[in-house]
Swiss-Prot record:
GO terms for cellular component: chloroplast
Organism: Avicennia marina (Grey mangrove)
InterPro entries per the UniProt record, alphabetical: Domain_X, Maturase_MatK, Maturase_MatK_N
Annotated compartments: Plastid, Chloroplast
Protein name as annotated: Maturase K
Single GO MF descriptor: RNA binding
Pfam families named among the record's database cross-references: Intron_maturas2 (PF01348), MatK_N (PF01824)
Keywords for the protein's UniProt record, in alphabetical order: Chloroplast, mRNA processing, Plastid, RNA-binding, tRNA processing
Summary of the function given for this chain in its UniProt record: Usually encoded in the trnK tRNA gene intron. Probably assists in splicing its own and other chloroplast group II introns.
Amino acid sequence: MEEIQGYLQRKRSQQQDFLYPLIFQEYIYAFAHARGFSRLILSENPGYDNKSSLLLVKRLITRMYQQNHFLICPNDSNQNPFLARNKNLYSQIISEGFAFIVEIPFSLRLISCLEVKKIVKSQTLRSIHSIFPFLEDNFSHLNFVLDVLIPHPVHVEILVQTLRYWLKDASSLHLLRFFLNEYCNWNSFILPKKDGSSFSKRNQRLFLFLYNSHVWEYESIFVFLRNQSAHLRSTSSGVLLERIYFYGKMERLVNVFVKVKDFRSNPRLIKEPCMHYIRYQRKSILASKGMSLFMNKWKCYLVTLWQWHFSLWFQPRRIYINQLANHSFEFLGYLSSVRMNPSVIRSQILENAFLINNAIKKFDTLVPIIPLIMSLAKAKFCNVLGHPISKPVWADLSDSNIIDRFRRICRNFSHYHSGSSTKRSLYQIKYILRLSCARTLARKHKSTVRVFLKRSDSELLEEFFMSEEGVLFCTFQKAFSTLRGIYRSRVWYLDIFSINDLANHKSRF
C-alpha cells in the first residue's frame, strides 16, 4: 500500500490520478486477493491454489500487454481467444483488480479527512444502530416524514460519467465502460432474479462501489439543495471529494422553486426550519418540522432531480408523505413512529389541589411481527400463520449442530432487535424458533415433541434460548440489579454493521 500511495503522490503534482498503469501490476491482484476485498473465483475452485491463481493473473497481464483486447468488438469473440476462453474467469480477475484500484484515491481522501477532523475510532461510527439514538433525540419534535425509495436502474454511461468527476484518468474510464458493457448486467445486480446471472454475485465489490458512487452523486446534490433552502447550513456532512462545474450544473434545479412567483413574494416559504436526512441502502428518510408544503416542495425537488440529472423516469408514487403522529415508517427492520404519551400530574397550591393532563411525544420503535413471520415461513421455520414446523433439511445434522444453528439465529435476532419498545414480539419469535428446534430434533429421533422433551434433559433447550437478561446476568453479576432496568428499556449496540436477515425480509439460513 505504501508503494501505491507513493505512486499517487507523484501523480498528484500534476493534479491527476492516473490509475490505469496499476492495472498491469501483479501485486495489485495479490492485494485484492489477500485483503479480502472480494472472493476470488479461483479460491472457490478446489482445482486451483494461490500460486496457480497468481500464475494465471500473470498470464492475463502478459496478454493485456501484448494485445489491446479491450478494443475488440464483442461479436469477434470467436476470433479472439481472450474473449472466447475463460470469459468469466478473466472478468472476475479484472473486476477484482479494478475495484481495488479505484478505491485507492477514495480511501486516501477518507483517511486524510478523518485525520483533519481528528476522528480516531471511525469503526464505532459504522454501526447502523447508532442512528436510532439520533432518531430518539430529534424525530420526536418533527411533524412530517418523506419516505423515499431511491430509483434504479441507472444507465451504465451515467455511472461512468459520475466517476469522471473524481477520476480524471480517461484510460481507466474507457476500460470500465467496456467492461460494464461487455460483461456486466447492472440491472440484475440491483434487482436479483432467480434465473439471473451469477456474474454480479462474483463481482459484488465492483458493483457495490459503482452503486455507492451513484448514491453519493445523488446525496451530494441533495445536500447542496438543502443548503440553498435552509436557515442553517448543514454541519453534519463533510465534503470529501472535489467537484467540477457542480454549482453551475445545479443552478437550474434550484431555480425550479426559488423563481416561482408565490415563493418570491414570501421568502419564509423557501427556508426550511428544521430537517433531517437518513439513508440505508435504497431506503432514505427525510423528516421535517415544517408544514406539508415543505414536504411537497422536496418531493418535486427529488422528482426533478432524478429526471433531469440522472435521466430516469422517477415515479412520484415512490415518495410517500406521512405525518409522524398518525403513521409509522419502516427503517432498518423497525417500525418507527412518534406517539403521544399521556401523563397526569397532581399539583397543589396552598389548600387547592388539581390535576394536569400532560402529553409528551415519544419516539417508538416496534418489531414488525407480520413481515418477520413471513420471513420465518419462507425459511421453513413455521407456516404462514406462525405455527412452528420442523426443519427437514437440518434433520441429518447432529443434535448439537441443530441446537447451535437455532441458538445463533435466536441470539442474533435478539441482539439486533434489542431496541424494541415492547418485548412481546421478541418472545413470539423466540417461541417459534424454540418449538421449531424441538420439532426438528423430534423428527430426527422419530418421536413426538412431548416424548422427546421428557426423554432429554430439561435444560437442553433452555441453555441456548437464554434471554438477553440472562446474558447480562452472566456478564455483569454484581451490577445485575441496575442492568435489569436497562434490559427492560431499549438497548442499542455499536457492533452491528449490517441489517439482520430476518429484519431485511430476505432470510438466508
